[in-house]
From Swiss-Prot:
Coiled-coil intervals, chain numbering: 859-931
Subcellular location: Cytoplasm
A UniProt-annotated Pfam family: Anticodon_1
One GO cellular component term noted in the UniProt record for this chain: cytosol
Catalytic activity reported: tRNA(Val) + L-valine + ATP = L-valyl-tRNA(Val) + AMP + diphosphate
Domain notes: ValRS has two distinct active sites: one for aminoacylation and one for editing. The misactivated threonine is translocated from the active site to the editing site. The C-terminal coiled-coil domain is crucial for aminoacylation activity.
Family under the similarity heading: Belongs to the class-I aminoacyl-tRNA synthetase family. ValS type 1 subfamily.
Name of encoding gene: valS
Summary of the function given for this chain in its UniProt record: Catalyzes the attachment of valine to tRNA(Val). As ValRS can inadvertently accommodate and process structurally similar amino acids such as threonine, to avoid such errors, it has a 'posttransfer' editing activity that hydrolyzes mischarged Thr-tRNA(Val) in a tRNA-dependent manner.
Major enzyme class: ligase
Name of the protein in its database record: Valine--tRNA ligase
Motif position, 'KMSKS' region: 523-527
Taxon lineage: Bacteria, Pseudomonadati, Pseudomonadota, Gammaproteobacteria, Oceanospirillales
Swiss-Prot/TrEMBL keywords: Aminoacyl-tRNA synthetase, ATP-binding, Coiled coil, Cytoplasm, Ligase, Nucleotide-binding, Protein biosynthesis
GO molecular function: aminoacyl-tRNA deacylase activity; ATP binding; valine-tRNA ligase activity
């Protein structure tokens, strides 16, 4: 089977994915212990960003690894209806067509959203396929499909029956542009420059005034108290008195509360319970009235004096300040830096707003969810995220689950004309249960928070409330892979809901990864113009197309110039096509536990070269083994060389390191171990060491067979070991190498084993670890490297065969020389190797050391004397520093007394070694000086 000369990912990736999907390789096998991962459902109409690609690579690596270990593997896929995000996209589309949702009406608007979902809902799933995600597409779910909608209604009704869902007036984050409550996650706190106004509030009895400070003067019209600290001596006598609230002309009490910081400002705080979260809590503690002064558009309503009604909040602020100033009640204005809450989608300032909403009472649900992590039923990786989880869970507010949107799960509650509320799975059930006959009913207009349905994700996708085979087999799931930013919004709620409805944890482990940032460590965002599209890494993109992508549809068009300039600087030639495998390997190499990762184009470039390296290694192996006797499935005699035994031994260590790292979610360590073994040991050394055996006349047929067998079997194991990281290139090569290594026939027979995906992941065999071979191979490599270094430093042409002398060697060195003379001569390009006894004198030479043994390259006619003096001087300087460091360490009583004896002894041995090497190099330097 001929392999293409060069590796071209675009020629193999998509066809392999289609092949795997059509063959059903992503489905659970039905054999082995179950292993299940639930994909965090991306927005149905969204597209894949670097964070998704990073997360999906981690999940796919785990899934492919466990599948190869024989587990009954399910990676459950699905998408989220993403209420607010999807509704906004469709509303923008309608605005472009000159209409809006209110003109269309609810039903027609929802038809439009479903239409939009059908049109663009496939983007993210197509992109997931491009990433190589081996999810079971036959089980794909959507948070608003019939089954999941049924589960949502079931959960709502059951929680309501138990009194755990209720309707009440509470303060929420209100988006005045979108006219809905939004979650904390959808609020961005932006640092902005503003003012702090200091006003005088007159005492009702006319005896003086208090000074209060605020950044939001317009809200003073809703004040219902002024608070001071109970221990503040300045105001002790005032507690219980009242203030005449200016402009509103009503009396409000002066109250004492620990919330007040007596050292901030005047130590007096205006309390507006209906428009500030902290004030709301103070208001509840003191039973204060809650006066909502805003409309849903954030204009002032009829609760304020007539002159302010209908003004928007910005106009109202100016009028309030002017009016108080005119009354002589404005004391001063300071510049002030403030954190302004803005809606992450609308960009407008969010209002704390008092409104009727549906809530989940979380206290009872939180207790078992805390216990599950405390007792180890659920473990966070890294463990420090458990503390973040606990701090949230122990300070939970009831969860506002209603949203004033049209797209989403409509709340299953109906109202009669008297305002009575009836909750049920559908209207029919409500009428029957409450004997309502044909009483007119209207359903609640609100929909549920998107996080409500996604909190049921692990069990609803497997068929709950029915008791299905899938639920019994795959629940609880094994691991959740998620970003830290949604531990509270999603992870905690999944744990609460799943424990409540299944008596099981949703997953046994939570692997928390960091954010993917740009090369400067900045968060990627459209407004910064630093977003990278994973598909552009795979397929490549021109500079012009990249600039166009980054500047199109900017919220702040003034940033276009700056973004263009930056893109020109970072990607002067656009982005090369690197292929999926190089992208995945880059993500994994950067995935150190829990930390944010800085994207590095140098890395992906390097890993594209790594793909080429593997490809070229496979071509070399194929050329030298195909059609030859590889000693597999035959009785022919096979003899292994030192290099063969060494690489087999090194493979066992690499397999163990990769498996242990994957088992502990250290994807960076696993990918590094695979890379080091494949590039440095197999490609750079073993392939070179195989050439003398395969191409030389000094070796027997049995030895040639041994090397051919080792070449193919180790390469085949490498492909299986690297497959979870790099699925496409490994499958392509395995189809050609597998049969040579005695594995399954190439694809096309329709057998389950016709793919590397279902081959066993290589397991380390301790019996194959050969320390003698490892010692010998390291010696051979060290001698070859030493000669090559001298060649490079002395500028000796590569083609020139050299004589070398070995001096001061031990018997073990002599034995290794005798056994490996051919390797050394061929790979170091030597014309002769002379062993010198202690009595023999050596010619003036360039010197390198392997242990205590000196490698001498005679200099006559070869060497640049000045360059060699400089080289040796540098080596000597380096060794002197090491001697000084070791001496300092051994003179330090803290080290000598406290370190284990073995560590101290090791340091002493190192010092002796450094001194011995130093003496030899100094002697050599003197020789050269007198040449």
């Amino acid at each position: 089977m001929i392999m293409d000369k060069t590796y071209q990912p675009d020629r193999i990736e998509q066809s392999w994915y289609e092949n795997w999907e059509q063959a059903g390789h992503f489905k659970p096998s039905g054999q082995g212990d179950p292993f299940c991962i639930m994909i965090p459902p991306p927005n149905v109409t969204g597209s894949l960003h670097m964070g998704h690609a990073f997360q999906d690579t981690i999940m796919d690596t785990l899934v492919r690894y466990r599948r190869m270990q024989g587990r009954n593997t399910l990676w459950q896929v699905g998408t989220d209806h993403a209420g607010i995000a999807t509704q906004m996209v469709v509303e923008r589309k309608l605005a472009g067509e000159g209409t809006n949702r209110h003109e269309l009406g609810r039903e027609k608007f929802l038809d439009k959203v479903w239409e939009w979902k059908r049109e663009s809902g496939g983007t993210i799933t197509r992109q997931l396929r491009r990433m190589g995600a081996s999810v079971d597409w036959t089980r794909e779910r959507f948070t608003m499909d019939d089954g999941l909608s049924n589960a949502v209604r079931e959960v709502f009704v059951r929680l309501h029956k138990e009194g755990l869902i209720y309707r009440g007036k509470r303060l929420v984050n209100w988006d005045p542009a979108l006219h809905t409550a939004i979650s904390d996650l959808e609020v961005e706190n932006v640092e902005e420059q503003g003012h702090m106004w200091h006003f005088r509030y007159p005492l009702s009895d006319g005896s003086g005034h208090l000074v209060v400070a605020t950044t939001r003067p317009e809200t003073m019209l809703g004040d219902t108290a002024v608070a001071v600290h109970p221990q503040d001596p300045r105001y002790k006598d005032m507690i219980g008195k009242s203030i005449r609230l200016p402009l509103a002309d009503r009396n409000i009490p002066i109250i004492a509360d620990d919330y007040v910081d007596p050292d901030f400002g005047s130590g007096c705080v205006k309390i507006t319970p209906a428009h500030d979260f902290n004030d709301y809590e103070v208001g509840k503690r003191h039973d204060l009235p809650m006066i909502n002064i805003l409309t849903i558009d954030a204009a002032l309503n009829d609760e304020v004096p007539e002159g302010y009604r209908g003004l928007d909040r910005v106009e109202a602020r100016k009028k309030v300040v002017d009016d108080l100033d005119a009354l002589g009640l404005l004391e001063k204005v300071d510049d002030h830096t403030l954190q302004v809450p803005r809606g992450d989608r609308s960009g407008v300032v969010i209002e704390p707003y008092l409104t009727d909403q549906w809530f989940v009472a979380v206290e009872e649900l939180a207790k078992p969810a805390i216990a599950a992590v405390e007792n180890g039923d659920i473990q966070f990786v890294p463990k420090n995220y458990e503390n973040m989880y606990f701090s949230w869970m122990r300070d939970l507010q009831d969860w506002c689950i209603s949203r004033q949107l049209w797209w989403g799960h409509r709340i299953p509650a109906w109202y009669d004309a008297d305002g009575n509320v009836y909750v049920g799975r559908d209207e029919e059930e409500v009428r029957a249960e409450n004997n309502l006959g044909d009483t007119p009913l209207s359903q609640d207009d609100d929909v549920l928070d998107t996080w409500f349905s996604s909190a049921l994700w692990t069990f609803s996708t497997l068929g709950w409330p029915d008791d299905t085979d899938a639920l019994r087999t795959f629940h609880p799931t094994d691991v959740l892979v998620t970003g830290f930013d949604i531990i509270f919004f999603w992870v905690a709620r999944m744990i609460m809901m799943t424990l409540k409805f299944t008596d099981q944890v949703p997953f046994k482990k939570v692997y928390v990864h960091g954010l993917v940032r740009d090369n400067d460590g900045q968060k990627m965002s459209k407004s910064k113009g630093n977003v990278l599209d994973p598909l552009d890494m795979i397929d490549g993109i021109t500079l012009d197309a990249l600039i166009d992508k980054r500047t199109k549809g900017l919220m702040q068009p003034q940033k276009e110039k700056q973004i263009t300039k930056r893109t020109n600087k970072d990607f002067p030639d656009g982005i090369n096509p690197y292929g999926t495998d190089a992208l995945r390997f880059t993500f994994l190499s950067l995935a150190s536990t829990g930390r944010d990762i800085k994207w590095d184009m140098g890395r992906i470039e390097g890993y594209r070269n790594f793909c080429n390296k593997i490809w070229n290694a496979a071509r070399y192996v194929m050329m030298n083994t195909e059609g030859e006797d590889c000693g597999i499935d035959t009785d022919s005699e096979v003899e292994l060389s030192l290099a063969d035994r060494w690489i087999i031994s090194a493979l066992q260590r690499a397999e163990l390191e990769v498996s242990e790292a994957l088992d502990s979610f250290r994807f960076d360590v696993a990918s590094h171990a695979a890379y080091e073994f494949i590039w440095n040991e197999y490609c750079d050394w073993y392939l070179e060491l195989s050439k003398p055996v395969l191409w030389g006349d000094e070796y027997s047929d049995a030895q040639k067979r041994g090397t051919r067998r080792t070449l193919v079997t180790v390469l085949e194991a490498i492909l299986r070991m690297a497959h979870p990281f790099m699925p496409f290139i490994t499958e392509e090569i395995w189809q050609k190498v597998g049969p040579l290594a005695g594995k399954a026939s190439a694809a096309g027979k329709g057998e389950k084993t016709d793919t590397i995906m279902l081959q066993p992941f290589p397991a380390s065999e301790p019996a194959k670890i050969d320390t003698n071979a490892e010692t010998g191979a390291e010696w051979v490599k060290a001698v070859i490297s030493a000669v090559r270094n001298i060649r490079g430093e002395m500028g000796i042409p590569l083609g020139k065969a050299l004589p070398i002398y070995l001096h001061n060697g031990k018997d073990s060195d002599k034995a290794l020389l005798d056994a490996n003379r051919v390797f050394l001569c061929k790979l170091a390009k030597l014309e002769s190797i002379t062993w010198l006894t202690a009595e023999d004198s050596a010619p003036a030479s360039a010197t390198a050391l392997v242990g205590d043994m000196e490698i001498l390259v005679p200099m006559a006619g070869l060497i640049d004397k000045e360059a060699e003096i400089e080289r040796l001087s540098k080596e000597i300087e380096k060794l002197r520093k090491e001697v000084g460091r070791a001496e300092g360490k051994l003179k330090n009583p803290k080290f000598v007394d406290k370190a284990p004896q073995a560590v101290v002894d090791k340091e002493k041995a190192k010092l002796d070694d450094y001194r011995s090497q130093l003496a030899k190099l100094e002697e050599q330097l003197e020789k050269i000086k007198y040449l």
